[in-house]
From Swiss-Prot:
Family to which the UniProt record says this protein belongs: Belongs to the RecO family.
Name of the protein in its database record: DNA repair protein RecO
Function summary: Involved in DNA repair and RecF pathway recombination.
GO cellular component terms attached to this protein's record: bacterial nucleoid
Originating organism: Bradyrhizobium sp. (strain BTAi1 / ATCC BAA-1182)
Biological-process GO terms, alphabetical: DNA recombination; double-strand break repair
Disulfide bond residue pairs: none
Gene for this chain: recO
């Protein structure tokens, strides 16, 4: 068995003296593990850091075997990502989210979303938008997508400002007004008709509150898990970075 694919490094686990088990989210083959010989060497180590995109050749005698990876670097962004707090926390959290996907099950859209997020992670607020959207996409990919395109009560497609915490459906301003204190805010950057510009710190927190609730309910708690520490670390790092920027 042999295939070649591009993959984003999610993590690395030492195996023996100089080898390691590498976990990738690949474009065509999903989340996939393989053994890398010489992983601790000076040439390989920089390539195998979380957040990098690599070209992987996987070989195994049988498909169900762990197999071996031969790795070449494509986009080595890990050092830049790890140089700021929101980057370090963000990469760790994104890897934890990607691990929610079934192993060896192709998820090309999630690969593309992850790559796009990592390529546009320099500014803390923009990185936060990417992560909220990635969490939303993970929910949809696992069968728990939210309906944010029309009002659950009236069918309206405009002025959607709330989300029902029960159904996960959007609610318009007029329909939701009597129950506003029971509904979740829908941040502007998650509305299909609006772009990313002009979001506030509160919009970002509202986005994380929204996706966090449904991730816990539908994905994490049924697996006996909670949110990763990196998620809280990322949110705090973004808040601090934006506060510093506001003082400049």
């Amino acid at each position: 068995m042999e295939w070649t694919d591009d993959g984003i490094v999610l993590g690395l686990r030492r195996h023996g003296e100089s080898s390691a088990v590498l976990e990738l989210l690949t474009r065509e083959h999903g989340r996939h593990l393989g053994l890398v010989r010489g992983a601790s060497g000076a040439r390989m180590r920089p390539m195998l850091q979380p957040g990098n995109t690599v070209r992987a050749v996987w070989r195994a005698r049988l498909d169900e075997h762990l197999g071996m990876y031969a790795i070449d670097g494509l986009t080595l962004r890990a050092a830049e990502l790890m140089s700021v707090a929101h980057g370090a926390y963000g990469v760790t959290h994104l890897a934890a989210l990607a691990r929610l996907l079934p192993e060896r099950d192709p998820h090309q859209e999630m690969y593309l979303r992850l790559e796009h997020a990592l390529d546009d992670f320099a500014e803390a607020g923009g990185a936060a938008v990417h992560i909220v959207r990635f969490e939303l996409a993970i929910l949809a990919e696992l069968g728990f997508g939210l309906d944010l395109e029309s009002c659950a009560a009236t069918g309206e497609t405009t002025d959607l400002v709330y989300v029902s915490p029960k159904s996960g459906g959007a609610v318009s301003r007029s329909a939701g007004a009597p129950w506003a204190d029971r509904l979740l805010p829908l941040p502007p950057f998650l509305r299909e008709s609006e772009d990313d510009h002009g979001f506030s710190d509160q919009d970002l927190l509202d986005g994380f509150r929204l996706t966090g609730l449904f991730l816990l309910r539908h994905v994490l708690e049924p697996r006996g898990q909670g949110h990763s520490d990196a998620r809280e670390g990322f949110i705090n790092a973004v808040t601090r970075a934006r506060a510093r920027l506001a003082q400049v």
